[in-house]
């Protein structure tokens, strides 16, 4: 008579183990004082273009809204180009002249 109903077992959740360290501070930040910026990459570095693109993708202000994750797991930047009517004032004029 003290059996637990099967439906109670469906709502029980196992406690997930939480890591003791949530994130680690890189050594470059730990060595700098206060809010000083870490040393930037060298201009002759072949990965400087990659690093600058990565910084743009991981920008905290946009919260990843401009980044799409593909099926393979790679991050791709969304590029949305919109034509404004102010840039193309004659966009609808041609249509009216042809009688459509």
Swiss-Prot record:
It comes from the Eukaryota. Belongs to the PRR15 family. Residues 29-51 are annotated as: Disordered. The gene is Prr15l. It comes from Mus musculus (Mouse). Pfam families: ATAD4. InterPro entries: PRR15. This is Proline-rich protein 15-like protein.
């Amino acid at each position: 008579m003290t059996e637990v109903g099967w439906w109670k077992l469906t709502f029980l959740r196992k406690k997930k183990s939480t890591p003791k360290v949530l994130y680690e501070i890189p050594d470059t930040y730990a060595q700098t004082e206060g809010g000083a910026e870490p040393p930037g990459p060298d201009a002759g570095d072949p990965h400087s273009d990659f690093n600058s693109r990565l910084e743009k993708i991981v920008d905290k202000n946009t919260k990843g809204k401009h980044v799409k994750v593909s099926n393979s797991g790679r991050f791709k930047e969304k590029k949305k180009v919109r034509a404004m009517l102010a840039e193309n004032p004659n966009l609808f004029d041609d249509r009216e002249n042809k009688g459509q």
